[in-house]
């Protein structure tokens, strides 16, 4: 047993749970409370502060896979063809800094819908009849960190729950052995607030997984306890539970510590379920080949396996889109990382009967300028633009083969059927069966919601 337990009886039972756990140095996967709590207690822990697991109206989707293209892809080089920009290439544009830069990439019509898509997304383009492409997105601030938080939490200035936390709050968990909300990232660069729960119960925040390594043990450190078997873990957890009960009787509950203890419980259950979910060697070779043996290929295959196991919201970070220079080379490289895996995901979800119950979202935090941004480099790129960008939806409840909204002839600003971040969030919640104005949580005397006091459902993308 750990050294922290070799103490006097007074210290053992008089210290706070926080002190005990800190001194034990318990890590993710080392402990869990599932071995000593009943299923009823576990269910209660999962639903602390959450509403009944019923939607406001029938849901079209039960799960979400959000492919977040962090860094802000250029809409006019991917989903929003602008032939008029070619006609004025190299010329000054009124109201714009610099000179116009036409897209160096060819656009072609795809599918029965005939929607034009850039050659950099030739794989996803084959599924264009399943996509609803919103070309009139706009946001408030063209700064990466703030805009990413806005896309993921609906808030610019204060710490608010992420959209995945709101979804889990509303729907509840569908698998007691897995977190209901998981964030997959190939590196550790992002702000944790992008998948946090803020003032919602702590167990609603995402479990963040670093997918930079292909092994289960590398992705989820300490998923297996090397020092204690399950019976020994039970004895240690029995002591933790006693301390927990005594502390709860005498002192006010500590929400952060309660969430931590619930995480231990989940960790115990995950030792078997997560090991299976993240083990891609169990997939047939043809499926692994379909996705590709790349970081994004592995991430999206894991995402499908998680949805298959009932995870409500999977956030997939697919960054590298901040192309201030060398856009001719860098943008196709970024697109190539996600094109084949995303196309594979759409194919795979369909063949497994999961497409109609899963909402798939792709998009970044804002768009790019229609003018050149050399940024000290001879090979130009594009600067930030919060007034226009593109997002696409697919899957449950989405009207495929649709283009919604439009930018001006050059792609500088959204001008027709403009869609704000709050509108996108309202639409996502609608597809999951929620009226975004009624999915609320009372905190500090006020009812909060994901969309604040704004947001309209984008009915034009609904099937």
Across the structure, where does each feature detected by a protein language model lie?
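Ligand-binding pockets and gating/stacking loops
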Residues: 1-463
């Amino acid at each position: 047993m750990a050294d922290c337990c070799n103490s006097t009886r007074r210290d053992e039972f008089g210290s706070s749970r926080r002190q005990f756990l800190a001194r034990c140095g318990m890590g993710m996967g080392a402990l869990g409370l599932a071995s000593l709590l009943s299923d009823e207690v576990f269910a209660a822990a999962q639903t602390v502060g959450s509403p009944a697991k019923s939607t406001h109206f029938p849901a079209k989707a039960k799960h979400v896979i959000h492919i977040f293209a962090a860094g802000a892809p250029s809409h006019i080089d991917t989903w929003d063809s602008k032939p008029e920009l070619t006609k004025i290439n190299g010329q000054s544009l009124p109201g714009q800094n610099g000179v116009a830069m036409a897209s160096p990439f060819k656009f072609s019509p795809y599918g029965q819908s005939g929607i034009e898509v850039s050659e950099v997304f030739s794989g996803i383009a084959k599924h264009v009849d399943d996509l609803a492409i919103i070309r009139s997105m706009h946001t408030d601030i063209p700064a990466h960190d703030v805009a990413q938080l806005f896309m993921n939490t609906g808030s610019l200035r204060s710490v608010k729950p992420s959209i995945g936390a709101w979804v889990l709050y509303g729907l509840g968990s569908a698998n007691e052995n897995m977190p209901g909300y998981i964030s997959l990232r190939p590196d550790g660069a992002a702000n944790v607030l992008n998948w946090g729960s803020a003032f919602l119960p702590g167990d609603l925040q995402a479990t963040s997984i670093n997918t930079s390594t292909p092994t289960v043990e590398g992705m989820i450190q300490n998923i297996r306890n090397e020092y204690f078997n399950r019976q020994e873990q039970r004895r240690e957890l029995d002591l933790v539970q006693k301390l927990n009960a005594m502390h709860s009787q005498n002192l006010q509950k500590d929400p952060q510590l309660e969430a931590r203890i619930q995480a231990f419980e989940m960790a115990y259950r995950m030792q078997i379920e997560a090991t299976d979910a993240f083990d891609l060697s169990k997939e047939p070779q043809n499926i692994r080949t379909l996705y590709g043996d790349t970081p994004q290929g592995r991430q999206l295959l894991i995402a499908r396996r998680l949805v298959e196991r009932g995870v409500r919201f999977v956030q997939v970070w697919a960054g590298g889109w901040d192309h201030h220079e060398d856009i001719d080379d860098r943008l196709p490289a970024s697109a190539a990382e996600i094109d084949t895996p995303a196309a594979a995901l759409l194919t795979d979800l369909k063949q497994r009967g999961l497409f109609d119950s899963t909402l798939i979202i792709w998009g970044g935090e804002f768009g790019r300028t229609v003018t050149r941004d050399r940024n000290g480099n001879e090979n130009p790129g594009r600067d930030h633009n919060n007034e226009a960008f593109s997002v696409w939806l697919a899957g449950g409840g989405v009207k495929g083969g649709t283009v919604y909204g439009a930018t001006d002839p050059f792609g500088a600003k959204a001008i027709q059927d403009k869609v704000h971040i709050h509108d996108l969030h309202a639409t996502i919640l609608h597809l999951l069966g929620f009226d975004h104005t009624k999915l609320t949580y009372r905190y500090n005397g006020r009812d909060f919601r994901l969309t604040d006091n704004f947001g309209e459902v984008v009915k034009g993308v609904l099937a």
